[in-house]
Each structure stands twice: as C-alpha cells, then as structure tokens.
C-alpha cells in the first residue's frame, strides 16, 4: 500500500493534480476550486470520511469518480490504493491526464482509472476492502443492480460509504432541483448553457430531453399528430428509448398515458443516465439491506454539537427534520 502523506505534502500534491489537465470539462469544474469551496475544507471532509469508514491503508473502489479529486485525496491522505471508475469517457480522460501531470511533478498517486459501468467492468469479486461514492448515485441507471454489484465486489467485512446531498427531504434543494429538471427537459437555452458552461465535451450535442423523446416517438411511424406526440413525450419523462417505444405502442393500442415518476423523471432518453434523481436516504438504506449489506447506518451531514449528537438516532421524523436543515447524508454499510 502507498504511504500516507502529511497534510501539507498531500495538499501540494492535490493542487498539482487538480490543475494537471486542460480538459475543457475539467476547466469548468475547476472554476469552483478555491471559490465555492476551499481545499482545506475538502481535505477535512476526506479525512473525516476515511475515519468514519475505516479507509486507511486499504484497497478501495470509487464508483462515479468524476475527475478523480476524491480518489486522489483518499490515496494521499489515507494511504489507500484506489480504483476510480466513471461511466463517462471525458471524466476518465481528465483523470488520466491529471495523474500523468502529477507523476511528472514527483507525485506517485495510487489511483487506477477505469471507464465503464460498474455492473459491466471485469473486476474480481471480493477484491476491495472498501467502496466509496460521493455525489454520484443520483445519476445511476439501476441502483438495485449497482448495490448488488458492490456487495459482490467487497470482501467479507468490507465497508461501503455513500455521501450525497441530492435529498428530497430538503425543501430548498428539492425545489431548486425540480426547477432545474424543467429547464433540462424543455429549454434550448439551458441546453446551450450546458454546452458552454458545464461540460462542453459531454454536452456537445445537448438538446432538451423532451425534444429527444418527441423525435423517438415520431420516428416510430405512428399516425399520432404533433399535439398527441407532445403529450406522449411529456408523459414518458423518465423513460429510456425502449420504454418510450413500448409506451407509444401501448397508447396507440388505446391504453392511458403513463405517469412520470415524481422524483426521477429528468433522464436522458438515449443513454438512460439521470441528470439527477431526488434521493430518499431511508429508501437507500433499505435497498442496501436488500442487497445483502449488514450494519447499515444512515447519518446526517452535521459535524458539530448539538446536531452531531443526533447521528445514529433511528427516528425518521427527527432525521427528516435534520435533512431539511442540511441535505447532506452519509450511508455506511458492511458486507
């Protein structure tokens, strides 16, 4: 296993890593670095997560690694060896470039980047001591399948840590997310903003999801007119291409229009990727148990007294109240 670095040495290495690529998508992400959040706040968070999950001198898997910032921090601060996985090629390109730049500057960061769906990658069962996922599972196509795969990849006694703030119990976050969904589904201006300001490579061909659904329905050669297609496109929000095709056939056969899911309808019809789900932490806890995990613990994101004292409280109303004050939640689960 790699050596754990002191905070100052790790800080230097991480700054070199973060600025180690001029990938267009990464440059947009990096605009928040040092402005919306500080590197010291980030390092404190990673150290706290290493302590919470026992991620010290371990072999870890990060699911949905993005540009690998957390993976690099887990390796440098915790002495961990990390396999960092993301489904988006643009993300893994950025990770690879940052690792190469950091290495050229003398930083040997124990991160291996792999592109693909965690459910499809050829990884040996029981080969990881821990699995980490931060701000990623809200995009996953099939959470039950992902949790089952993670359970398979962990060794007995291994720990999974999920950190996320896409929390439907937080009123402000929920309303802001629903507003964003409406823009992503309907607005050409928003699609152009994604190309320009968010991820220029990933969103190069972005269009409103409703437009994509209308194109899919129109391509099926039915006798539906433009108004009927528009209504069906609205009703199939949250579906992928195969589901849209099946729903269209059902409607043409005389069945009622489908009803989009309340908290998971902003979805790319072609890739199946969710722009973002509004997650239910209590539902996720139950899904982890159903996937075979033990000792599943749900925690809120407060780390100061008095709210910190309520971590571990099993009362759903108390935790829902806490989540409405701050959306961040953490789930730990053992194999």
Task: Place the predicted regions along the sequence by residue.
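N-terminal, positively charged/glycine-rich alpha-helical extensions of SAM-dependent methyltransferases
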Residues: 1-28
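Conserved alpha-helix/loop element of class I SAM-dependent methyltransferases that forms part
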Residues: 36-56
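Conserved class I S-adenosyl-L-methionine
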Residues: 58-66
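Class I SAM-dependent methyltransferase SAM/SAH-binding core
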Residues: 69-120
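A short acidic, Gly/Pro-enriched loop at the edge of an enzyme's catalytic core
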Residues: 119-130
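A short SAM/SAH-binding and catalytic strip from SAM-dependent methyltransferases
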Residues: 130-141
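Helix-to-beta-strand junctions that scaffold the AdoMet/dcAdoMet cofactor pocket
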Residues: 140-141, 154-156
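S-adenosyl-L-methionine-dependent methyltransferase catalytic module, highlighting the catalytic core
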Residues: 144-145, 149, 159-330
